Amino acid sequence: MEKIILVDGNNLLFRSYYATAYSGNFMKNSKGFPTNALYGFTNMINKIINEECPTYMIVAFDKGKTFRHEKYEQYKDGRIEMPDELKVQFPLAKELLTNMGIKYYECDNYEADDIIGTFAKYCDEEEDFIGTIVSSDKDLLQLISHDVDIKLLKQKDYIRYNEKSFKEAYGIEPINIIDLKALMGDSSDNIPGVKGIGEKTALKLLHDYKTLNGVYDNLDKLTPKMREKLENDKDNAYMSYDLATIYKEVPMEISIPDIKLKNKNSDKLNEMYKELEFYSFLKKEEKKVDNNIEVKIIENTSEINVQKDSAYYLEILGTNYHSSKILGMAIYNEDNSFYIPFQILEKKHDFLDKLKYTYDYKKNYVALKKHNINILNTNFDTMIAGYLLEYNIKEDISYLANSFNYNIPFYDEMYLKNKSKSLYEEEDIKKTAKAALLKAKFIYETKNIFEEKLKEEKLLDLFEEIEMPLSKVLGDMEYNGVLIDQNELNKLGEEFKIKIELLEQSIYNDAGEKFNISSPKQLGEILFDKLQLPHGKKNKSGYSTSIDVLNKLLGKHPIIEKIIEYRTINKLYTTYVEGLKNAICRDGKIHTIYTQTLTRTGRLSSIEPNLQNIPIRNEYGALIRKAFIPSENGIIMSGDYSQIELRILSHMANIDSLKKAFYDNIDIHTKTASDIFKIPTDLVDKKMRRIAKAVNFGIIYGISSFGLSENLHIRPKEAKEFIDSYLQTYPGVKQYMDDTIKKAYEDGYVRTLFNRKRTIGELQNKNYMIRQSGERIALNTPIQGTSADIIKKAMIEIAKKLEQEKMQTKMIIQVHDELVFDVPNNEKEKIEKIIKDIMENVCELSVPLNVEIAYGKNWREAK
């Protein structure tokens, strides 16, 4: 028997799109092109082929209005118009299918269901064929027969129905799905059915009378009320029957031989996968790069011979390299290549000066330094180069390598089993050695390619002068770590627990009952059903109880303030008190990981644990910082740029009045309030300054009047007046914004003062809201990115100075505009001058950079 797979293409793409469209995981490639529907679609198509092993396959698509619209003009009325982000993915889905060797088809005046129905009928009539339909559309259940089954897709799986299992589930025959739709209607297709009859009632009628005709032939046996409903809507019922019936005689220009699976066009498929940045699919296609490599495993230190500049790759088991096991190192150049197991590597280091090129130098540097192995001559990191060139960089090198057609196993495939990240397979040294050597080969062979691209994109200086030197600086910060006062954390934890318990009891008293405060559903029922507080629209999961919703309810009931405080303290306790305690290493320190290749603006981020997210604007968050302490006989010192982004804005936009205020060391928010409210500075009150501050920083992020109104809890009209007044007061800012956005549209990207580049694909989108988002990115990136570049330069220069002066001071934390140091008491005065001098003079702008120095016996006091 030959198998035919019949796929509902529209259904698959819609499902894939909406699975992530509003979840925070909306996929785009680095150019901003939406890819979420395509990714899910491609994944499902591959899965179908692997599971079903068909000989024939057709993917059917809708093509505009059909004969059903002629019968009923309102057919499918009320459906939300297809989003532009989904619409643009349809042509590429069809192109992907063609390159996968799969036939797709669409036909004027007919739906995808009708095309599927026509081929399903063929399976029924021909003895040598069986069919499987793939869709989540229940309309297609009517096509189930002896020779046709259906995989009805669910959220994370599917249900397979054949004649027997369908009847067991529904109690009717598959063909009676048409009768069911005729009675109950279908809101998704705007099929009216009989008013007042739902699925449960319709199924009961069909159990008793089999068909729609059977129901109408037995009206006298029904209750008067039911009979009235059916009589009143008889025309609608029969029209609905016609609309729900899948047509099986579509006049198609293709036949069975045309839908036989063909060979893939791997070259074109790979090109598409690279363009879409579907690196996980690349590994499944044939590669152009030779995957064969001699696997030489070093057994004795005498065999190690490195005469030329080489690429290297450190194979590490685990994602947190502060505690992970090093398996070994692969070394590659055009003359020789070999793999050194770690127990051999530990014994010989005299060749390390030849190791010049790698992937994720910081990881290698820190992991080896923990074993007293110093690798200091690396000058090219492919991970950083790829990041600056806007490749989709991940921790696993295989994603980048596969985009260059290197067939390298992914980390998960190598070391994880059962998809559990805590269970590692036994190390197979030959497998490990080959994978590591292929990675080193990729690094070596593409080094010049990346270098040329960096030159072409005017990014080489940024790479060589900032990002590469910074990776070692960050490595030293991670290695040094920051000392934690565990007693202080424990004490704080106990205080938080007591406060949480008191708040819980007070909230229960206000609510009049006990409930799960952390459950949005239960909280929503208490606030909006029981206490009758104003609320938004209720959705399937209940009322929204987000912080934005709660903030709007402040002052309307005492319970609101307590809930906000409860959430704040509870998060601090679980995320920071307990989280930080779990992250403390044997040396009593926390060793975070600074990621250099994550944000599009160039800002650094911190993970495992995140030290940049510890709240400082509330009293409880500030208490967490008390636990960060210096080494013995030392202090914590902080150097913090004052209003650096506003200074960069005044430089870029060339605003004389703002520049003068910075030169005269006038409070910029008071100055702005004075200007926009047109009053002397001594008459500016706290509220005016707060508004001016919100506008100052909002302008940097391209804030809308609605956004400002939300921040300040004022009407959008009032917020618009503040923004308009600001832009009239500082016309240079408006000119700068207009010029920046215009140039971004022309070029497709923006740059920082140090040439960091960010491509903004959102500007090419047809959707107005997405283009607006792109414009905000265009305004913010040059400012925030320049700020990130400046502090990076300062970090490099400070690290150099500390080394030159042979000082014991250690740089231990970076939080956006702030650097934190562990300073011996006897170096306090000297290091304060060094930090301030370097941070303020590392970059020459038309306004002065100002750094505020603070110190104390813990991080909280150094603020």
Question: Which ranges hold each PLM region?
Answer:
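Non-catalytic nucleic-acid-binding/docking modules located in mid-to-C-terminal regions
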Residues: 54-58, 91, 100-102, 125-128, ...
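Active-site-proximal helix-loop-helix substrate-binding element of RNase H-like nuclease domains
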Residues: 106, 160-181, 322-455, 466, ...
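C-terminal polymerase-core module
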Residues: 498-505, 509-561, 728-782, 826-863
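Noncatalytic, basic helical substrate-engagement surface that gates or grips nucleic-acid strands
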Residues: 2-134, 140-160, 236-239, 245-253, ...
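Conserved "right-hand" nucleotidyltransferase catalytic core of DNA-directed polymerases
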Residues: 233-342, 355, 423-616, 635, ...
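Conserved catalytic core of nucleic-acid polymerases
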Residues: 423-425, 479, 585, 591-592, ...
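Conserved RNase H-like, two-metal-ion catalytic cores of nucleic-acid enzymes
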Residues: 4, 15-50, 58, 73-74, ...
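Function-dense linear segments that define catalytic or interfacial modules
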Residues: 331-335, 388-419, 435-442, 596-680
